[in-house]
Amino acid sequence: KLFVLMAAAVVANPTLAAGDAEAGEAKAAPCAACHGPGGAKPIAGNYPKLAGQGEAYLVKQLQDYKSGKRENAIMAGQVANLSEQDMADLGAYYASQEPSIGQADPDWVEQGAKLYRGGDMANGLPACSGCHGPAGQGVEGTKYPLLAGQNAQYVEEQLKAFRAAGRNDLGDNVVKRTNDTDGDAPGMMQTVAAKMSDSQIKAV
């Protein structure tokens, strides 16, 4: 598998506070319980790695958890008392850490690589690399996140949540995730993931 999580659309945001990585390290102590020391080794596959992730992307996710735009009961509690400066410091700290290497499933690598680099033009699925870079390194200035090395289970769950939002799936156990919209149009990741099959999501 290529451990790829496709990201949010580019949206203008208020100017972020300048982050202090040293201050962020002290503030990150509670985060380590789930995401591991330095954010490199989460306790479970459905928790994301944070080490080396783009600073602006991390801050944006914390802001979205706090506002309720991105829903997660655990994270909502964790960010409830964070200030903008706290979030900036945490973003700076985790962005300064060395990302860890993920494990690849050889049965899915070839298909995942083709989809990531070339998409599925017959079905209108764009290449992930167009936004996330040829090696999944992300594009910090646009808040497209680092994808290389991310936990496969987390990637798969997030893509399915984007897909559920894009297709407006119904059901008591359906988990949806949305990202920023362009006017009245659905957000980029909902639109992209809605075109993906289960096998394509697993491969990517």
Set out the residue ranges of the language-model regions.
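Electrostatic cytochrome c docking/interface patches
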Residues: 13-28, 38-46, 95-122
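Gram-negative bacterial Sec-dependent N-terminal signal peptides
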Residues: 1-16
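Sequence context surrounding c-type heme c attachment/ligation sites in exported
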Residues: 23-32, 55, 117-129, 144, ...
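The canonical Cys-X-X-Cys-His
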Residues: 29-37, 90, 125-134, 204
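Detector for the c-type heme attachment site
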Residues: 34-40, 51, 95-96, 131-137
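The feature marks the first
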Residues: 21, 25-67
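Axial heme c-ligation environment in periplasmic c-type cytochrome domains
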Residues: 42-49, 64-107, 140-146, 163-203
